[in-house]
Structures are given as structure tokens and as C-alpha cells.
Amino acid sequence: MTKKIAVFPGSFDPFTNGHLDTVKRASRLFDEVVVAAMTNTSKKPLFSSEEKLALISESTAGLPNVKAMAAPKRLTVEFARSIGARFMIRGIRNVADFGYEADIATVNHDLDPEIETVFLLADKQYDALSSTIIKEVAAFGGDVHRFVPAPVEAALYAKLGDAHQTK
């Protein structure tokens, strides 16, 4: 029987508890989940590719069928095909996410009809969570521990200054 391999692509800058929740749920559905740190050409990343991989790996260490990989600059479906993945995981927080992700899923299906996009609805506690908001909160010294895994929290404060600790 063929292994069911899924890719969960994203810029993960930073990797959040919402991302982690999606990965945990996907890990129960698939034999292997590859968290693919992608390059988003429209964003200036806070973390390097190597830092993202380390943070994702630390955050998912308790999930034996999950691994983090850096995806080269190419289409996500091409990356998925190159590692034998037949499923692409996308987390959906709200209606706006669904519209955007449905459009991408349609294009991905046109590019490779063998790769299915699977939408996982975010737990309601994560539906307003975004990497951008988390970086903003951390930059102004806000407490982000409930929004990100512990390794990411430490890395955020190290990158953005430890304003939270001085309060």
C-alpha cells in the first residue's frame, strides 16, 4: 500500500500554535506530513530558512510522522510531486482564507490533478491568529506564549528584543 504523504506549505514566519494544531491534526490523517517552509517572494522574512526549519522541528518533535523541509523556490505542486506527496494541507481560519485558498487549490489542481488539497478548519481559538499579528505583539513587548510554541517564543524575543522581559 502506498504511503499517504501530505505537504503543509507555508512561510511559517513564525510557526504558530495554529500551524502546530493543523500539523497535529494532519498527522493523524496521513502516514507522513512534511511541513514545507516555502519562500514567499512578497514577504520579507524575520527568520532564515534554517531558523524556520529548526523551530518547526523543535515544535513538532513529539510527532514521529512529521518532518520539516525547506522547499526550493518553485511551485508548491512541483515540490509536492518531487517528494511523492499526493496531498496538500491548508488551514482555514475564516471565509477570507477559504476564498483565497480555494483559488490556489483550483490552480494547483490544474497544474497537477493528482495532488489533492485538503482543507482543515482552524480551531476557533486560532481563527484570528496570524504570523504578522504575532510579530507585531512581540515587537512591542507583548506576551506571545499562548500564540506560539515555546521554541518560537524564545526565538521571537531574541530577534525582536526582549521587551517583554523588561515589563
From Swiss-Prot:
List of residues binding substrate: S11, K43, T76, R90
Site (Transition state stabilizer): H19
Subcellular location: Cytoplasm
Residue positions binding ATP: S11, F12, H19, G91, I92, R93, E101, Y126, D127, A128, L129, S130, S131, T132
Chief site of localization: cytoplasm
EC numbers for this chain: 2.7.7.3
Single GO term (MF): pantetheine-phosphate adenylyltransferase activity
Any one GO cellular component localisation term in the record: cytoplasm
Known catalytic reactions: (R)-4'-phosphopantetheine + ATP + H(+) = 3'-dephospho-CoA + diphosphate
GO terms under biological process: coenzyme A biosynthetic process
Superkingdom, taxonomy of origin: Bacteria
Pfam families: CTP_transf_like (PF01467)
Keyword annotations from UniProtKB, A to Z: ATP-binding, Coenzyme A biosynthesis, Cytoplasm, Magnesium, Nucleotide-binding, Nucleotidyltransferase, Transferase
Metabolic or biological pathway: Cofactor biosynthesis; coenzyme A biosynthesis; CoA from (R)-pantothenate: step 4/5
Needed cofactors: Mg(2+)
Functional note: Reversibly transfers an adenylyl group from ATP to 4'-phosphopantetheine, yielding dephospho-CoA (dPCoA) and pyrophosphate.
Quaternary structure and partners: Homohexamer.
Entry similarity comment: Belongs to the bacterial CoaD family.
UniProt name for this protein: Phosphopantetheine adenylyltransferase
The species this protein was found in: Lacticaseibacillus casei (strain BL23) (Lactobacillus casei)
